[in-house]
Structures are given as C-alpha cells and as structure tokens.
From Swiss-Prot:
Pfam families: Gelsolin, Sec23_BS, Sec23_helical, Sec23_trunk, zf-Sec23_Sec24. Changing residue 559 to M: Abolishes binding to and packaging of cargo protein BET1. This is Protein transport protein SEC24. It comes from Saccharomyces cerevisiae (strain ATCC 204508 / S288c) (Baker's yeast). Keywords: Cytoplasm, Cytoplasmic vesicle, Endoplasmic reticulum, ER-Golgi transport, Golgi apparatus, Membrane, Metal-binding, Phosphoprotein, Protein transport, Transport, Zinc.
C-alpha cells in the first residue's frame, strides 16, 4: 500500500484529532510550549491556533485501521448523543478543543456543574484518541542517533494515566494509586487479547504495598469505624471510581457493573464532626486501609515472634560472625518492634547439636539470676524434642534483662568450640515446633555449609560446569528437596525464614535461598566476611539491625482483582502461591516488591478498566487491617496509543522476573535469549505496525521516546552478574538472582544500570546540604548529576563514584593531580591511597573531602531497604605505575570488577550498547 511509505515523520506521529508536535518535544510527556514565547507562529510550528479543531480537509496520515475509524466517527458521535448512560455524564468530543473551566479538585463531581478541566502543564496534552478521549501522544526517536542514551529518562515518572476527572467521585491526585504503590506496564490497556498479542508488549503490575521500613512514615488514611463496603458479586471494595445511582441510594461497581445498596452508615457521622460520604477515605483515596472487623479474623492477631537460629560452629567463631551477631542483637534489642508489648524472643545455638536456653522472667531475678539461664543440649538430630517449650519463647518486655544477660554469655560459652558441623535442617525443624503455634520469623545466621542431619549439603564441583548449559541444573538448582518441602509446612503455620549467610567458603545459596523464597523472607549473602575487617562488620551489623527493627505484618494474603476482561495469571516474588489468585505471606516485609502478570481474557467494552490489590494482614500491634490499592487505566483499540503509554521501567521489571524464572527453571542461555528477544520483538513490531516503512538497511532504528531506555536496560541486564556469560561463582550468581526477583523497582533499575557520578568537576552545591527557601540547611545532601555508565566518559585524571545499589566504587584516575589526591585522601602520592574495601579518611580542612563523604553517606541513607553499600576504592591505570607494585594483583581485580558495572561498554564477550543496537537493527531488517 503506497500510502504506508509516508509514515516516517520528523515530528510526533499523527492520529485523528491530534495536534502535530515537534520532534524535539521532551519525553516528560508535557504539552508543547507556547510558540509565541519563542517568537514563532503556530503556522510555523505546524500546529493549529489554540482551541482550533483540525480541518477535515487537511491531509491526515492514517493507518488503515485509523482510516476505518475515521469514517466511523460521525456515526459514533451520533450514537453517543442517543445513549443514556446511568449516572455517567456525556461529554461533547469537540469540547476538548474549547476553553475549559477548571474542575475544583477535592470536590465531589455530583456537586459540580463545570465541564472537564483542560490538562495542566506537565499532564498529557489534549490530543484525542480514536474514541475522542485525551490520550498520550507518540514521539518517535532514532535510537542510534541518541547515543549516548539520555539516562535522565530513567528518573522520569511513567506516562500519565489519562483519567478524566468526571470518572472520579472526588477528583484529586489521591484518587488514583501512586506509581510508588503500583505500576502497570501499559498505561493504556488494549481492549482485546489480539491487540495485546500484536503489540508484543507485556501486561503486568509491579506492586509494592509498603513504601518504608517503618509503618509510622507516611501511612495511608485509615478507616476505623468498621464499615467496609464491598460489591456483592465480585467482592471488590468501594473506591473512588464507583458511581452513585438512584439519588445516592445505590452504587454501581466499576469492576462488574453490579448495582449495590449503599449502607446507611455511610451517611452517618459524629455530630461533633459532621462529614458526608464524600469525606470518607474509600471515596477520596485509591490507597487506604480499613481496621478489619471480627469477621475478617480467624483468631486473635498473634504476637510478633522472633526465633534466632545462630551458628556457633568453629568457622562462625573464627570469622567473627558470632561475635558480630551477638553485639548487634545487644545493641538493638530495644529496636525490635514491640508496639503492643507482646513481642516474643527465642534463641537457639547450633553446631552438631541444638542448644536451647531457658530464660526466666526479670521479676524472678535474685542474686543467683545468672544461674537461672539454663542451656539444654539436644544431640538427637533425628527426632529433636523441646525440653521446656514454655520457657524458651519468652516475652521481650518481661525478660528484657535476662535476654541481654544470655547474649553476653553466649560468646563465652562457645569461645573454645572446635566443632565444625552445622545441623541446620534439624535446627529448623526444632524452631518450627517451637513457634509453630503462633507463627513468626526464624532468622538464621550462618557461616557454615549445613553438613549434618536432614538437609545436609555437599560442596558442588563447579569446574567444567560453570558457563555451560549444565550450570542451572548442576549449580543453581536445589540440592536437597528438604529446603522446598519445609517451606510448605512453614506456610501452613505462618512462619517466615530469613537467612544471613556470611562466609569465606561455599554456602550453596542456590539451595538455602528456597527457604526464604517460598516463605516471604529474604536471603542476605556476605561473601568473604571477616570480623577482622571493620567494613565487613559495619555492613553486616547495619543490615542485620535494620532487618530486625523493620516493621512487618503477619498472617497476610494478597489478591489482585481486575475489572471485566482482566485476569491475574502469573505471580512473581517471595511468597507462597496458595491458590490461582491468592498469594500468602507468613510475614510481609517492607523492603520487597512483587509482579503480577495480567491476561486480557475477553474484549473490554468500557473506556476504562480497573485493578484493585487487597492485602489482608495482622500488624505487630495486635490490629487486623486491610490495605486497598486501586488503579484505573484507560483502554484503547489503537496500537499507537498502547505504545505511547507503555512504562519502560515496569516492562524492564516484568522481563527481569521472567528471566529469573527462566534461569532457575531452564538455563542461563534461555534467560539471555528471552531478554534479547524482548527487545527485538518490540523494535520489530514498532517498525512494522507504527513506522510502516519499506526502506532498507539505511533506515533509522525507530522507537517511541517513552521506551527509549528499554533496550538499554535489557542489554544491561544481560551483563548483570545474574545472567552474564563467563565464570561467575555459583553462590554469587544465585544470590544475584535471588535479589533481582524481589528488589523494589527503583533499586532494581539501579542494580541493572548503575548511577555514575563525576566528582572532580561536580557542581559547587553538590555534596552540601539542600537549602530551604529561608537559607537553612536540611538533612538531605545535593547529589551530582549522573553520567552515562561508560568508560569513554572517564578522564585519566578524574574522580568517579559508581553506585549499583549493592556496592560503591570510588575510581581515582591513575593520572590524577596530587592536589586532588590530597584533598580526598590526605596524601599526595596516589600509590599511598588505600584500595579495596575501605572508607575515605577524614581530611581536616578539606571541604572537598567532606563533600565526597557526604555524597557517599547520602547514597547509603535508605528508609525503605536495609541495604548498606560497602565502598571499594579503585586506582585507575597509570603509565607511571610500578610493574611490581605490592597491590598490583588486587588493583587489577578491582578494576575488572568496577569496569563490569560500566554496562554501555564492551564487557568480556558482551558487545557494547552501540553494537547491540546495530545487531538489533540488522535482525529486524531481515
């Protein structure tokens, strides 16, 4: 078809009713700037005057589908005039082109008479989709001419969810869920499965129910009156997108369209604080909580229970792990959540036997109180029994002093222990019987490979298997079925297993991580841990302390409901999948994210669809609550609109989860193929269906601006330790895979594409506190602008900081001037600076040293994850570097490791990003 040859434009691609927009339009999805401000006329910009409707006589560049819909517009408009939708206001399609009266945000639409507001600056422009609704525009770019890629796009918000205010009962920014809680890969949902399949874009939801480690930080609004209004048919909860009908006596569900009665209690309020139904949280807020009444509770919410299972074998003692663990517990006993003063503690020590401790109440203390803490050793590992169960799980409040006394005695008891065995399996079963009546957390701290009793593991032979097709089956699979079967038992009694593995030796993370994966826990791995290195101690103790002080909820289930046509099909993350649509969490942590895959099972007739996530939970303050997260999304029959509203970061998270699953269940090669194919399919589909160009190999590599970082993220993911080819120790690879499947989105992106900062030429305000309008300093430090992760931007005399979310690398160029070296390290000789896992020394009277340390501290400051990044100091190559320098080998290893984070470069056998794009272009041109 000849008219297809004209589909490549040096500007935004056109659809019926849209204004042409310059190609230079930024990717922030903002409306075009006023041309008059730039001294240009609208005619020069190729845009009609403000408020004008495009002439029907003007040439329109349309796909066949658009032409067909173009012909149907008059008929559809006429039909709309004849329709009478119950309680749904009809909007004149042409009204979007006329001056609008702003809607008063926060006021119920039933109390307003104004038409819909025109979008404000920073919102999607009023470009009409094929059904005459405002939709996001498509801005084409050429990936090969945008090199290096504009990495600032990684910090942009997703394409807006274009929901007109009249769709909300009380229009406000809180009426639709924030992307911090839930992000859809598609912010314009295809109306049928064939369009979704044709797009080659995935449909999934990235969900993070909690945003902070501690629940008292920015909590959502809470309903405490006990009234919970749900649809009788689909059981969805009342939300800002329902409609009231029959003079407000009934409400229509936005999920299944059923009309339900409105409870009288909705309009009853405290006489001293009169409120209308529109003041209720479920009407105003898409994210809110209910205090659950008794019918949502099978039993009294249990107390928060912690069972610490501590390795006291010889390797744990020699490495300093035991002493570090005990000291951290002693310093943070008062930080363990105990909101209702019911928190309980149990401590088990394990080597070739299980050592229980009877801890008396503080009120029973007397002059011989130290003798009242009895240790009972159980050597029968086949059928271990509980000698005194009632006195081994004790109240933190009632036994606080004696718990501290016990912790101070444990290092003394085992200081001369020569036993090298570690019976983890029997100890887990004992802990299970100890706290199984109420559930809780089993926190394992281990520095030894389990080598005794049930769950005994062997060191695997990695030579000849690493970097082959056998790697997954022989190194990344679970070595003993106990570690999967045990999680089923734990899920039944609400027990989570968390692991802290710290050793210089092999630990079989691939097997042990199953304990946390299926019980909603987490595995933390500290390779090469040594108590002689203070930096190792700081990292372990910081993360362990934040973990045990983190709030969590118990007896938790999470379900996502979709409106008609949508169905949740697959679930990814750390939890137990109890049924086809129910995810069970023995305890729900605050530092993890989850991904749900969505199917379009039947055609969606409505202009908007909805997803609602409900989390039923017991807090560690004796309260039973329900957290509700509701998301509204527009639907479309236009492939261009689907692409224009695609969220590149959420899509990257989707394929990351798919790749982790493929790596664990199939092979690493299959995972890499999946990652690369995701990019190839999207580029090919965009070229075929959107660009529609018949030009040969010289054609540009087109993609829409809102997806231009997606190929970079996927290419970077293939270079991640979890997936890259080459020799990677199996423990490191298994740990990386474990982290990728549970990281919150912003940390996942940083893990895939690290932040790189140039420090030697940073702005004057970088490294200093943010100033308020009054000139007062805040506690937040100004960070430098990041640069692309490529060595081509590294100067031999520069200073650079790399942050991949797990580690920090401070790269000092080998030819740095002595003044810079002195300002940072307090010495002018670059060969005297410390290298490896170190901290920057404090240099008196050096403002630059203070600024660099401030930046590092700011990057380590998190209130939503427990991670503490160790700092590695790397000295760059120099022509003056002595060949036989004492640190030559260590420096070479550090340079190789740090360079592997510069993911735009050619790394080992992996091509550079430019080469990757050339390969993709060649493949889709065939």
């Amino acid at each position: 078809m000849s008219h297809h040859k004209k589909r490549v434009y040096p500007q935004a691609q056109l659809q019926y009713g849209q204004n042409a927009t310059p190609l230079q339009q930024p990717a922030q999805f903002m409306p075009p700037q006023d041309p008059a401000a730039a001294g240009m006329s609208y005619g020069q910009m190729g845009m009609p005057p403000q408020g004008a409707v495009p002439s029907m006589g003007q040439q329109q560049f349309l796909t066949p589908a658009q032409e067909q819909l173009h012909q149907q517009i008059d008929q559809a408009t006429t039909s709309m005039n004849d329709m009478h939708l119950h309680n749904v206001p009809l909007v004149d399609p042409n009204a979007y082109m006329q001056p609008q009266v702003p809607v008063q945000m926060g006021t119920p639409l039933q109390q307003q008479q104004q038409p819909m507001a025109a979008p404000a600056y920073g919102q999607p422009s009023a470009a009409m989709g094929q059904n005459m609704r405002p939709m996001n525009q498509l801005y084409p770019i050429d990936l090969l001419t945008e090199l290096p890629p504009p990495i600032t796009d990684l910090t942009l918000p997703p394409p807006p969810l274009v929901i007109p205010p009249e769709r909300m009962l009380v229009p406000s920014e809180l009426s639709n869920a924030s992307p911090d809680y839930i992000r859809s890969t598609l912010n314009a949902v295809p109306k049928n499965s064939s369009l979704l399949k044709k797009s080659k874009l995935p449909f999934g939801l990235v969900i993070r129910p909690y945003q902070h480690l501690y629940d008292d930080i920015d909590p959502p609004p809470l309903n405490e009156d006990g009234l919970i209004v749900r649809c009788r048919r689909c059981r969805s909860y009342m939300n800002p997108f329902v409609t009231f009908i029959e003079q407000g006596r009934r409400w229509r569900c936005n999920f299944c369209r059923l009309a339900n009665d409105v409870p009288m209690q909705m309009d009853q309020s405290d006489p001293n604080d009169p409120k209308s139904r529109y003041d209720r949280n479920e009407i105003k807020c898409a994210v809110m909580e209910y205090m659950a009444p008794k019918e949502y509770t099978l039993r009294q919410p249990p107390p928060a229970t912690y069972c610490f299972l501590i390795d006291v074998s010889q390797s744990s003692i020699k490495s300093g792990l035991l002493a570090t663990t005990i000291n951290t517990l002693l310093q943070n006993l008062d930080s363990i959540p105990n909101h209702d003063e019911r928190t309980r503690i149990s401590i088990l020590c394990v080597d070739n036997a299980i050592h229980y401790f009877k801890i008396p109440l503080d009120s029973e203390n007397n002059e011989e109180s130290a003798d009242q803490i009895n240790m009972m050793d159980i050597a029968d590992l086949e059928e271990p029994f509980l000698p005194r169960p009632n006195s081994m799980v004790v109240s933190l409040k009632a036994c606080r002093q004696n718990i501290e006394t016990l912790l101070t005695k444990i290092p003394q008891i085992f200081q001369s222990n020569l036993i090298t065995n570690f019976a983890l399996g029997p100890a887990l079963k004992s802990a299970y019987h100890l706290i199984g009546g109420v559930g809780g957390k089993i926190i394992v701290v281990s520095g030894t490979l389990p080598n005794l009793g049930i769950g005994k593991l062997q060191r695997r032979n990695e030579s000849g298997v690493v970097n082959t097709s056998k790697e997954t089956a022989q190194l990344l699979s679970c070595q003993d079925s106990f570690y999967k079967n045990f999680t089923i038992d734990c899920s039944k009694v609400q027990i989570t297993v968390d692991l802290f593995l710290a050793s210089e030796d092999y630990m079989d993370v691939a097997s042990l991580s199953n304990l946390s994966r299926f019980t909603a826990g987490q595995t933390h791995f500290y390779p090469g841990f040594s108590g002689k290195n203070p930096n190792d101690i700081v990292k372990f103790s910081t993360e362990f302390a934040k973990h045990i002080s983190m709030d969590f909820c118990m007896e938790t289930v999470m379900r996502a409901r979709g409106s008609t046509g949508l169905r949740m099909s697959r679930f990814y993350g750390h939890f137990f999948n109890r049924s086809s649509d129910l995810c069970a969490f023995s305890t729900m942590p605050r530092d993890q994210s989850y991904l749900f895959e969505v199917n379009v099972d039947e055609s969606i007739m409505a202009d908007y669809c909805y997803v609602q996530v409900a989390v039923l939970l017991s807090l560690n303050n004796s309260q039973r609550r329900i957290r509700i997260i509701t998301l509204a999304m527009p639907t479309t029959e236009s492939l261009a609109e689907v692409y224009a509203s695609a969220d590149q970061l959420a899509i990257a998270s989707f394929y990351n989860s798919k790749a982790v699953e493929k790596a664990l269940n199939s092979s690493l090669d299959d995972a890499r193929v999946l990652i690369n194919k995701s990019v190839q399919d999207i580029l090919a589909t965009y070229k075929k269906e959107i660009v529609v160009s018949n030009t040969a190999g010289g054609a540009p590599l087109r993609l829409c601006a809102n997806l231009r970082m997606f190929p970079l993220l996927m290419h970077s993911l293939t270079k991640h330790m979890a997936f890259r080819s080459g020799i990677v120790p199996s423990d490191h690879r298994a740990s990386a895979l474990n982290n990728l499947e549970s990281l919150p989105l912003k940390y996942l992106i940083k893990n895939i594409y690290p932040d790189v900062y140039s420090l030697h030429d940073m702005a004057d305000e970088a490294g200093l506190p943010v100033q308020t309008e009054d000139g007062e300093a805040t506690g937040t430090i100004v960070l430098p602008q990041p640069i692309n992760a490529t060595s081509s931007l590294f100067e031999r005399y520069g200073l650079y900081l790399i942050d991949n979310g797990n580690e920090l690398f401070l790269w000092m160029g080998g030819d740095a001037v002595p003044a810079l070296v002195f300002d940072v390290f307090g010495t002018q000789d670059i060969f005297d600076i410390p290298i490896g896992k170190q901290e920057i020394p404090v240099v008196e009277n050096s403002e630059f040293n203070q600024r660099v340390r401030n930046i590092i501290n700011q990057l380590r400051n998190h209130d939503d994850v427990i991670t503490y990044q160790s700092l590695y100091i790397v000295r760059g190559a120099s022509l003056s570097e002595p060949v036989n320098h004492a640190s030559a080998r260590e420096v070479a290893t550090l340079r190789l490791w740090a360079s592997s984070t510069l993911v735009e470069d050619k790394i080992l056998n992996n091509e550079s990003y430019r080469e990757f794009l050339q390969i993709m272009k060649a493949r889709i041109s065939k």
